[in-house]
From Swiss-Prot:
The active site is at 124 (s-palmitoyl cysteine intermediate). The DHHC domain is required for palmitoyltransferase activity. It comes from Homo sapiens. It catalyses: L-cysteinyl-[protein] + hexadecanoyl-CoA = S-hexadecanoyl-L-cysteinyl-[protein] + CoA. It is found in: Membrane. Probable palmitoyltransferase that could catalyze the addition of palmitate onto various protein substrates. The chain crosses the membrane at residues 19-39, 53-73, 138-158, 167-187, 202-222. This is Probable palmitoyltransferase ZDHHC24. Pfam families: DHHC (PF01529).
Length: 284
């Protein structure tokens, strides 16, 4: 029987719109960061050594961020191309009527991707793709380096934004921080002032969001859970922090955070998973 997801495509304009908007916002943040590091506007000005160190840190963060984004988008966590027929169906297997296929435990069907995802966690709206077995590692590293980049930009833009705000009344300051678009459209700020306020606002909010996401998924990582399993209170796959880290990040789990292209193959296949019950039977 043909698989409906084999012919389906999620590469249309609606599916790619979140990714395009995310890329445009990331480009704006990158340009603002380069502007601050190269020209050093606002007090206090960066010295040559400080500027060189900041540029090196920014390059390291951006390489890691872009590398993990590329790995995340290139990795397919779905059942496409995975040989499921002929495998022994055991406890936890289910039949997906949309995909017309048996699917293994921890899988879930995504209505946006129109296919079942191995070890499905959730659908990432900003990047337009599901987070699952095949791309969980770059997703976690992406959260870490995105939070770092956004925090870095916020700190660098802080002095310039502070100088801008001190030159105006408190009401003007509040309006610029809360309604920068309105201030631009009414002609009360220049385009450069709007860009400074808007990028700083979004960077602070983005850093908080990515930081919260990293803490949440770090907790799930140590517990060996997906978001769905956490919501349902399931702990069947929690084999201890060390085993859970290796299962999700590979044997070099402590180093994968430093470079996206570091080889650390996952020990599993996304289809069969060891449970706490299996460990108990083996020990007995």
């Amino acid at each position: 029987m043909g698989q409906p997801w084999a012919a389906g495509s999620t590469d249309g304009a609606p599916a790619q719109l979140p990714l395009v908007l995310t890329a445009l916002w990331a480009a704006a943040v990158g340009l603002e960061l380069a502007y601050v590091l190269v020209l050093g506007p606002g007090p206090p000005p960066l010295g040559p050594l400080a500027r060189a160190l900041q540029l090196a840190l920014a390059a390291f963060q951006l390489l890691n961020l872009l590398g993990n984004v590329g790995l995340f988008l290139r990795s397919d966590p779905s059942i496409r191309g995975v040989m499921l027929a002929g495998r022994g169906l055991g406890q936890g297997w289910a039949y997906c009527y949309q995909c017309q296929s048996q699917v293994p435990p921890r899988s879930g069907h995504c209505s946006a991707c129109r296919v079942c995802i191995l070890r499905r966690d959730h659908h990432c709206r900003l990047l337009g793709r599901c987070v699952g077995f095949g791309n969980y590692r770059p997703f976690l590293c992406l959260l870490l380096h995105a939070a770092g980049v956004l925090l870095h930009v916020s700190v660098l833009l802080g002095p310039a934004l502070s100088a801008l705000l001190r030159a105006h009344t408190p009401l003007h300051m509040a309006a610029l921080l809360l309604l920068p678009w309105l201030m631009l459209l009414t002609g009360r700020v220049s385009l450069a002032q709007f860009a400074l306020a808007f990028v700083t606002d979004t960077c602070v909010a983005g850093a908080l969001l990515c930081g919260a996401g990293l803490l949440f998924h770090g907790m799930l990582l140590l517990r060996g859970q997906t978001t769905w399993e956490w919501a349902r209170g399931q702990h069947s796959y929690d084999l201890g922090p060390c085993h859970n880290l290796q299962a999700a990040l590979g044997p070099r789990w402590a180093l994968v955070w430093l470079w996206p292209f570091l080889a650390s193959p996952l020990p599993g296949d996304g289809i069969t998973f060891q449970t706490t019950a299996d460990v108990g039977h083996t020990a007995s």
